[in-house]
Swiss-Prot record:
Gene: DRD4
InterPro entries referenced in this protein's UniProt entry, alphabetically: Dopamine_D4_rcpt, Dopamine_rcpt, GPCR_Rhodpsn, GPCR_Rhodpsn_7TM
Chain spans, region Disordered: 230-264, 317-336
Protein's name in the database: D(4) dopamine receptor
Binding-site positions, (2R,3R)-nemonapride: D115, S196
Disulfide bonds: C108-C185, C372-C375
Localization terms from the record: Cell membrane
UniProt source species: Homo sapiens
Entry superkingdom: Eukaryota
Glycosylation positions in this chain: N3
Sequence intervals crossing the membrane: 30-50, 72-92, 111-131, 153-173, 193-213, 347-367, 383-403
SMART domains reported for this sequence: 7TM_GPCR_Srsx
Keywords: Biological rhythms, Cell membrane, Disulfide bond, G-protein coupled receptor, Glycoprotein, Lipoprotein, Membrane, Metal-binding, Palmitate, Receptor, Repeat, Sodium, Transducer, Transmembrane, Transmembrane helix, Ubl conjugation
One GO molecular-function entry: epinephrine binding
Length: 419
C-alpha cells in the first residue's frame, strides 16, 4: 500500500531506502545497491506490465472469460498496471539515487497519494474477490441469476472510492509541514501512517481471512451434503419387479392381463368385462366431435372454440403439470457451480498465503516505525519489505490466472501467436 511511503522517525525514506544517507550515495556500496535496484526494478515493472496486460487482453478478447467474477480480476489487474506505470518508476529512481529525492516536493506528494491509493485498491480488490466467492458459495443459484452484474459493479466502485478516500489526505496538504526536508520523500504524519495502515491492511486482511474461511467451510458442507445425497438416493427409489422409470406427468398403471385389446378404464366409465381393473379399449369411448386432437379442458382454462367441453391437449398438459426445471438441467447447473467453486477452493490457500507473505512484513515494520519512534529499524529491512509488497502485484496474475485452465489456454494461444 502506499503505506510503503510510511513516515519514518529515524529519517528513513519510507519504503524507499535511507534518506539520511543520501550524502553517501556516491560510495561503492550504495552504487552497487543502486545498480541492483535498477535491474530489479526494471524486471519487476516488466513482469507486472506483461502479466496484468495479458489478463486484461484475455478477458477483453475471449468471450468465455467475460464472466462477472473475472471483472474483479480485471479491476485488480488495472490497479497493478497503474502501480507499475505511475509508482514503480519513481520508486526505482529513488532507490537508484540511494534514497534521496531530487525531484519537486509536489511530485513527491503525488507519488505518495498514488502509492497509497493504488496499493490500497490492489488489496481491496483481493477482498472484493473473497466477498464474491463467499456469495457464490452461500447462495450459488441466486448468485448466477439475480443481480450479479450490479453486485460486481457496486463492489468494484466501492473498492476504488474507498481507496481514493484513504489517499485523499495526502493531496489535501497533509505533507505540507514546517521544516520538511525536500530531499526526503515520505509521509510526514505518523497518525496518518497508522490510519492508512489500519484502513489498508489491518481491517481488510482479517475480513478477507474470515470470508475465505467461511467459503472453505461452506464448500466442505456442500460437498458432504452432495455425497450423502448421492449415496442415499438408491434406497429411496421405489422397489418393484421392473426397473425404475423416470417420474412421468401421471402415474403409470400396471398392464392388464386381459390382452392388447384391454385398456385401463377412463374416469366415469363402467368397468370392463375382463376384470375390475380393465375397460374396453379406445373404440368403446365416445368420439369427441372436435376430433382426435381434443381433450377435456383443464380447470381455470377458457373453453376451446370447438366446444364448451373441449380444450387443446397441449394446454391441458401444460396446466396439469407444475412448472419445474428438468432434473437434468438442475443436475448440470449444480455440477457446474460445484466444479467452479472447487477450483476456487483449491486456489484459496495460494491466494491467502501469497497475500500474507507479501504484505504482513511491510505493514508490521512500518506501523512499528510510526508507533515506536525510538525503535531502530535497519534501512535495508525497510527497503526489503517494501520491495516484497510491490512483488505482490506481479504475483497476482500468476495466482488468479495460471491456476485457471481457461486463462491458461488463452495465454498459450497468445504466446504461440507472439512466437
Amino acid at each position: 500500500m502506499g503505506n510503503r511511503s510510511t513516515a519514518d522517525a529515524d529519517g528513513l525514506l519510507a519504503g524507499r531506502g535511507p534518506a539520511a544517507g543520501a550524502s553517501a550515495g556516491a560510495s561503492a556500496g550504495l552504487a552497487g545497491q543502486g545498480a541492483a535496484a535498477l535491474v530489479g526494478g526494471v524486471l519487476l515493472i516488466g513482469a507486472v506490465l506483461a502479466g496484468n496486460s495479458l489478463v486484461c487482453v484475455s478477458v477483453a478478447t475471449e468471450r468465455a472469460l467475460q464472466t462477472p467474477t473475472n471483472s474483479f480480476i480485471v479491476s485488480l489487474a488495472a490497479a497493478d498496471l497503474l502501480l507499475a506505470l505511475l509508482v514503480l518508476p519513481l520508486f526505482v529512481y529513488s532507490e537508484v539515487q540511494g534514497g534521496a529525492w531530487l525531484l519537486s516536493p509536489r511530485l513527491c506528494d503525488a507519488l505518495m497519494a498514488m502509492d497509497v491509493m493504488l496499493c490500497t485498491a490492489s488489496i481491496f480488490n483481493l477482498c472484493a474477490i473473497s466477498v464474491d466467492r463467499f456469495v457464490a458459495v452461500a447462495v450459488p443459484l441466486r448468485y448466477n441469476r439475480q443481480g450479479g452484474s450490479r453486485r460486481q459493479l457496486l463492489l468494484i466502485g466501492a473498492t476504488w472510492l474507498l481507496s481514493a478516500a484513504v489517499a485523499a489526505p495526502v493531496l489535501c496538504g497533509l505533507n505540507d509541514v514546517r521544516g520538511r526536508d525536500p530531499a526526503v520523500c515520505r509521509l510526514e504524519d505518523r497518525d496518518y501512517v497508522v490510519y492508512s495502515s489500519v484502513c489498508s491492511f489491518f481491517l481488510p486482511c482479517p475480513l478477507m481471512l474470515l470470508l475465505y474461511w467461511a467459503t472453505f467451510r461452506g464448500l466442505q458442507r456442500w460437498e458432504v451434503a452432495r455425497r450423502a445425497k448421492l449415496h442415499g438416493r438408491a434406497p429411496r427409489r421405489p422397489s418393484g419387479p421392473g426397473p425404475p422409470s423416470p417420474t412421468p406427468p401421471a402415474p403409470r398403471l400396471p398392464q392388464d392381463p386381459c390382452g392388447p385389446d384391454c385398456a385401463p378404464p377412463a374416469p366415469g366409465l363402467p368397468r370392463g368385462p375382463c376384470g375390475p381393473d380393465c375397460a374396453p379399449a379406445a373404440p368403446s369411448l365416445p368420439q369427441d366431435p372436435c376430433g382426435p386432437d381434443c381433450a377435456p379442458p383443464a380447470p381455470g382454462l377458457p373453453p376451446d372454440p370447438c366446444g364448451s367441453n373441449c380444450a387443446p391437449p397441449d394446454a391441458v398438459r401444460a396446466a396439469a403439470l407444475p412448472p419445474q426445471t428438468p432434473p437434468q438441467t438442475r443436475r448440470r447447473r449444480r455440477a457446474k457451480i460445484t466444479g467452479r467453486e472447487r477450483k476456487a477452493m483449491r486456489v484459496l490457500p495460494v491466494v491467502v498465503g501469497a497475500f500474507l507473505l507479501c504484505w504482513t512484513p511491510f505493514f508490521v515494520v512500518h506501523i512499528t516505525q510510526a508507533l515506536c519512534p525510538a525503535c531502530s529499524v535497519p534501512p535495508r529491512l525497510v527497503s526489503a519489505v517494501t520491495w516484497l509488497g510491490y512483488v505482490n502485484s506481479a504475483l497476482n496474475p500468476v495466482i488468479y490466472t495460471v491456476f485457471n485452465a481457461e486463462f491458461r489456454n488463452v495465454f498459450r494461444k497468445a504466446l504461440r501467436a507472439c512466437c
